[in-house]
Amino acid sequence: TTLNQAGNGVPVVDIATPNGAGVSHNLYQDFNVAPPGVILNNATGQLTQTQLGGLIQNNPHLTGAPANVIINEVVGANPSQLQGYLEVAGQQAGVVVANPNGLTCDGCGFINTPNVTLSTGKPVLDAHGQLQMLDVKQGALTVGGKGLDGSRQASVDLIARAVQLNGALHGKEVNVIAGANRVNRQTGEIRAQQGDGAVPEVAIDTAAMGGMYAGKITLVGNGAGVGVRNAGQIGASAGEVVIGSDGRIENSGRISSATQL
C-alpha cells in the first residue's frame, strides 16, 4: 500500500496486491478522508479517468487482476474522520473501512463501489483469503450533520459497538448492526460476545436531526440498555423496515415503510 496524489492534489492510495480471493488488505496507522476526497487505485489500465482526481496512472501493485474487495484497516490508535468521498478508480470493488477506535462520517460518500461497510470491528479472513467476519468489541460509528451518501451503492452496512446518527444516511439498502458481536459476512450470522469497556447506553441512536432514508432498512441492536432509539426519521421508500433488538426500542420520531414494519 503506497500513497500518491492526483494532478489536482487529491490523495491516491495504490492499494496492496490482492490475494487469490481478490481481496486487497491494506493496513494504516491513520485513515482519514478530507473534503476533497481520496481515491483507492484499483486501475490496471495505463491512464484511468476518475471523478475526484481526473486522469491518474495505473496502480503498480496490480500486476494481475484488480481487487474485488478493498479492506482498509486501521491498526493505529486514532479514530477515522471521513469528510469527503472515497472513489474506487478502475474496476469496481467493494469497500470496507474498519477502525476499532471509531469512525465519524460527516459528509462522506462513495463512488464506483457496489457495497460499502463501515465498521469498528476487526476484519477476519478465512483460509481462502475471503472476508469471513467482523469482530466487534468496541468503538462508536457516528454520522455527523453533513450525512452519509450511500445512494450510488446497492448496500451500505454500518457495523459497530454503537451507532449514532446526527445526520442523514441515504442508501438503497441500509443495514445497521450494533453491539459487541461477531458478524459473519458470508452467512449473515450475528453472534453476541463480551465487549471491551463500558456498555453504550444506546446501541443505535438516531437524533432529531438524524435519519435513514433508503429502499430497505434493517436495524439490529444488541447489548444491555436501549437497543434502538429514534428521535429522527427512519423511512423505507421501496421495501420494509426491519428492527431487531435485545434492549428497548424507543421511538419519538417517525418510522415509515412502503410495505411493512
Where in this protein do the model-derived segments appear?
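Solvent-exposed adhesion/ligand-recognition segments of exported proteins
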Residues: 1-237, 244-245
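Extracellular beta-solenoid/beta-roll
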Residues: 249-251
